[in-house]
Amino acid sequence: MSAYAEHIKTVCSRFDKALEDNNFESVLVYSGQPRVDFLDDNAPPYRVNPLFKYWVPVTESPKSAIFYRKGSQRPTVYLFQARDFWHAPVNVPEEEWQQHVDLKIIDDLSMLTEDLGSDLEQSAFIGEDFAQPVSDWRVKARNPQALIDHLHFHRSIKTQWEVDNLREANRLAAKAHVAAKEAFFAGKSELEIHHAYLGAIDFRESQVPYNSIVALNSHSAILHYDVYDTVPPKQIRSFLIDAGARYRGYCSDITRSYAYEEGFYANLVEAMDKAQQELLSEIKPGVSYYDLHVSMHLKVAQILSDFEFIKGDAQSIYDKGYTSAFMPHGLGHFIGLQVHDVGGFLKDDKGNSYERSERHPFLRLLRDIEVGHVFTIEPGLYVVDQLLEEHKDSADINWEKVDELRPYGGVRIEDSIVVGADGNENLTRDAFKELGAE
């Protein structure tokens, strides 16, 4: 059986259990449609419903839908192909997935409702329903949270087909990262580096899974920086790039940091890279991701001590809360159909969830690690003045050292990890190794 055949079998089984547990006979998953801007007739780029592309690798077909009846083991895909002379038709090439579904081409949503008849009224509807006629459809329930929670909990365990797609997404992004790195060392501006990244993989800006972070010098301290200066700085010091790609609807999310010259910042990047790789060896089924996060904070604390940013040993630096000022974000998150993939707070498929940590409120993943999980590991260290204000009177902090780092901004390194029963796969580093880049 092919990887996709196994995948759709798994998806059918997961939907069967979710529908059974929540008293639904069937479900209609709507792909979504563009939403025009306020007082305008233009729409931002369309993003498909993740639960639609969970079934089939179709990401550019708005107004389409998937109907699945519990126990049928075969979904019906209503693929919308508009009779439209204004736009290019949606290109859906013949692929294996079409052998595992009943495919029906429609050019009007009334064709879907007529085909389903009374089945529609017995279905759970999952998707956006802001526009007619979808908002007028009579369905049993719209976006029932219990059903969605059930599906989201199990989406954390990736099928082999999903891992294969994530691997390809990392290969694409690694290729683009290499081009961006070359542009950085060639003295290009942030915008030029951004263009080099997109050009290396022939992506439009709307095709990357999130706004790429392309940050030179002190901009690296802005966690979600996406301004892109058009002129390079007079003195180039550092480069942080956080950017991904998509393949068949699956996302990659890679961060790398580079020093323009050898010295203090280059040593800091090397230390963070070493600490990150040490943490990777701690990833095992049954380990709490929260405990991994704390372990990384202790490693960051050791770096703060080793580089004389803060006086004291690693444990005392962590206990006093200093690491949260230098690494305010979480260690990572699930990744898959979405960059910040779902289910990170769910305890079970009944919707019970973990409370966010008071000490680490921005951590997006609190579950114990399981075989089949795919998540990012992305430690960082930055000069964020807003966060350092709380410690402005601290005698423990070596402010001269902080000032030395300030023009470099910060450092972050991010890989995606597949958890296996007999060892883990680093999708990101493997992709760079294939290119001879790491």
From Swiss-Prot:
Gene3D superfamilies, A to Z: Creatinase/methionine aminopeptidase superfamily (3.90.230.10), Creatinase/prolidase N-terminal domain (3.40.350.10)
Lineage: Bacteria, Pseudomonadati, Pseudomonadota, Gammaproteobacteria, Alteromonadales
Known EC number: 3.4.13.9
A GO cellular-component term linked to this record: cytosol
Protein name, per record: Xaa-Pro dipeptidase 2
Cofactor(s) required for function per UniProt: Mn(2+)
Organism: Idiomarina loihiensis (strain ATCC BAA-735 / DSM 15497 / L2-TR)
HAMAP family for the chain: X_Pro_dipeptid
Molecular function GO terms recorded: aminopeptidase activity; metal ion binding; metalloexopeptidase activity; phosphoric triester hydrolase activity; proline dipeptidase activity
Membership in a protein family: Belongs to the peptidase M24B family. Bacterial-type prolidase subfamily.
